[in-house]
Amino acid sequence: MDELGIPVYKRGFPEHLLRGYEFTIDVGTKIESVGGRHDVTKIPEMNAYDIKQESIRTALWYNPIRNDGIVLPRVLDITLRGYDERRAVVESTRHKSFHTNDQWVQWMMKDSMDAQPLKVGLDDQSRNVAHSLHNCVVKIDSKKADTMSYHVEPIEDASKGCLHTRTMMWNHLVRIETFHTAQEVHILFKPTYDIVVHAERRDRSQPFRPGDQTLINFGRGQKVHMNHNSYDKMVEGLTHLVMRGKMPEVIRDDIASLDEICNRWIQSRHDPGEVKAYELCKILSTIGRKVLDREKEPEDEANLSIRFQEAIDNKFRQHDPERLKIFEHGNQRRDEDRFYILLMIAASDTFNTRVWWSNPYPCLRGTLIASETKLGDVYSMMRSWYDWSVRPTYTPYEKTREQEEYIYGRVNLFDFVAEPGIKIVHWEYRLNHSTREITYAQGNPCDLYPEDDDVIVTKFDDVAYGQMINEMINGGWNQEQFKMHKILKTEGNVLTIDFEKDAKLTTNEGVTMPEYFNKWIIAPMFNANVRIKHEEIAQRQSDDPMVKRTLSPITADPIELQRLTLARFYDIRPALRGQALSRQQAQSTYDEEISKKAGYAEVLKRRGIVQIPKKPCPTVTAQYTLERYALFIINYLQQHVARDCDEEAIYEHPKADHELEIFGESIVDISQVIVLVFDLIFERRRRVRDVYESRYIIARIREMRGKEKLNVIAEFFPTYGSLLNGLSGATVVQDIMYLNFLPLYFLVGDNMIYSHRQWSIPLLLYTHEVMVIPLEVGSYNDRCGLIAYLEYMVFFPSKAIRLSKLNEAHAKIAREMLKYYANTTVYDGGDNSNVVTTKQLLYETYLASLCGGFLDGIVWYLPITHPNKCIVAIEVSDERVPASVRAGRIRLRFPLSARHLKGVVIIQVDLGGRFTVYSEGIVSHRVCKKNLLKYMCDIILLKFSGHVFGNDEMLTKLLNV
């Protein structure tokens, strides 16, 4: 057949009369526009795709479960490329057979980040699959529905410099935490306590005595507030305090739900069947999120939640030994208290240590928060009232803390509701040296001993470091046991100090503040300065994460933020605001603020953007950020190879080279940056490889083990590979410096989970000597990905150290490092495909609300079998942009196999049901009227002159070649 008819009908036309047609368009079913824009808030009600109506940042982590299956818009492009690259194999029977690179095809499909969770209508009688658009409904025979996919686009706004073909790039940057803003960690009195002045003293030399209730400045029952004189006296250690549980209003309803479960349990005479662990866990998680919402939670949160539910079930069993002890007759306590005590024991056992407010798991911190509203300081009460103590098997043990009470808790400054002027406690964090004037000869070694008497300095513990090195030399790299915090001295250890735990209330001394309070701590190995101090709120809470809340905020520069390795001192969020589904809404001020950065126009000029918008589209910010980030990474790493240059010339470091010449593809993915680093620095190639090749190179390197991994590296990067192979004969420090490039292959990926969050990898650190340090790539102390690694690379040795001879220990260390990287699986903790790969539709829908509005369409591919095999794309869409533009966008879906797309048909339907048809390539069209009995509809006749279409199982065959 060389002609295809597509009926277009309105409401009232009997659909069963069109049963013989494989593709129909119902223009009578539509979603009314609002304000000239498609009403995308109706998407959850449509037979379209699975996006929930919720906060945009919450939507990023939504697992689409209300769908009928996931499709890949580019599956034909991938499989056709695989078909094109078939290899002929002569079998034993002398017959020739063809085989595709199945490994590549499967990887490409798994690696696709634009999967669509379709939510369609299914008609059992007609066997049709219905896809809703805002202006019509498209129905297709189920036999041919496997190539259907949505084609939605946000309309560009010229005033914002939009380039919406880069939406995927924006999606990618958010996934690798490079399109984020930050707020410094904020600490305040726990809202679960009323803190009351019980007694006072005139100076700290006068101890508090049991039973003493002497008051000097305050009346009986005076509560301590941070903006009150009572707080100042407390900080000075002049007040003795008592704590009582208090109910924060934000969780009142949730605590009431817990009380209902508790009351049922009590009334049933402690029947464990009344304690529904799943229901409890949901409520406790809600409490944990409301009080301290980190938005992004640990990947293993679901598994831990299951373990917590099991611990609850075990602890409430009537014959559990600890439960029996808590219910001893001599213990005259309330059953309500026992209920929360048992929950806290279950939470502590699940985490295998004491639970704090800063706990990353919402169900566990929610348990602590809920228990504090009833019991005050929970662990102190458990020890004094119930004789329960933390177990010796807990890590860390923290038994000594049971004699103390803790009044401060961490909250998220993004969500903290407070008026300007309110006093808070917060961490400041800035780079120790943003840039330095250096020469190649002197290098930029890390100065471990800064001269400043007024600061605390984080220092290496020489004994602990020596023990680690001996263990490494004798037994290889121990990724599970080697930790950075273990080789630092206790004083000023920025990986272990914790104000929430270090500021405490004791019986004899009142509140004691840690020695480091209000003092700068210089951590030279992290290039970091941190200080905790009192500060004031400067701005009210906002859904815009870019709003800086304090008078001394953390940096807003996207590249400088990549340099702040110590994640424990700040919180991050994607620079997005508003709802996932909205017709029109304000965007974050992030993009506008970033556009004010020095060099902004210079960086964008490299991308061909000359006219700089005042309020840029996020796609402009994404291009700026990745381009500048790439230049910074290259600048950092160029310092680690031998160079021919004026060794005494003074230059600023680090500093991105905006004049660096590179060619080829535009950089749209961090994988291209990583591959370019090796191509440019080692192979002297300035051409940027395309995104698919770059991602595949990294995937191939990761999947190999041992010698095969090194062979694959050498296959793609021969010069670098030869340097690694020559490591066994290394004689000077420069010979082993190339090892520090290896983490680039393993640290970053937008659908990657680390095998373990606390595993460490080895890295060379250049100080007055060459050291090796454990880098915990996914720990709670560090940011993930390259952010955990990059700032260590700002340090590089002087020429004298580069050329100094290796000692025996360094040579052995280098061999062990190479052995570790050849076999590491630190990146191989699985993936989160259902969540991560299905967000492209979300980004496009959300971006439409920030820019010019929303376009939707659905694409079907018709296979041509004669005279040449090819395909024709047929799209049904709205009429809001020219059909030729839509056709061009469809061609962009075929970057790998464009030669197979020989024709495009665009059927555009407006809100009134009127339609127009556009065709190009091997297909032409005409529109006719068709009478069926007393009914009339339109028929779009598509003519494929000289070509025959068919082959319903085209995709099935391609996937099985």
UniProtKB/Swiss-Prot annotation:
Q: What is its main location?
A: virion
One annotated GO molecular function is: structural molecule activity
In Pfam terms, one family for this protein is Orbi_VP2
GO cellular component terms, alphabetically, are: viral inner capsid
Provide this UniProt record's keywords sorted from A to Z: Capsid protein, Clathrin-mediated endocytosis of virus by host, Host-virus interaction, Inner capsid protein, Viral attachment to host cell, Viral penetration into host cytoplasm, Virion, Virus endocytosis by host, Virus entry into host cell
KW Cell division (keyword) present: no
GO process terms (BP): clathrin-dependent endocytosis of virus by host cell; virion attachment to host cell
> Which InterPro entries does the record associate with it?
Capsid_VP2_Orbivir (IPR001742)
Compartments reported by the entry: Virion
> Which superkingdom, per the lineage?
Viruses
Q: What does the protein in this record do?
A: The VP2 protein is one of the two proteins (with VP5) which constitute the virus particle outer capsid. It is the major target of the host immunogenic response. Responsible for viral attachment to target host cell, probably by binding to sialic acid. This attachment induces virion internalization predominantly through clathrin-dependent endocytosis.
Q: Which family does it belong to?
A: Belongs to the orbivirus VP2 family.
The name this protein goes by in its record: Outer capsid protein VP2
Give me the gene this protein comes from: Segment-2
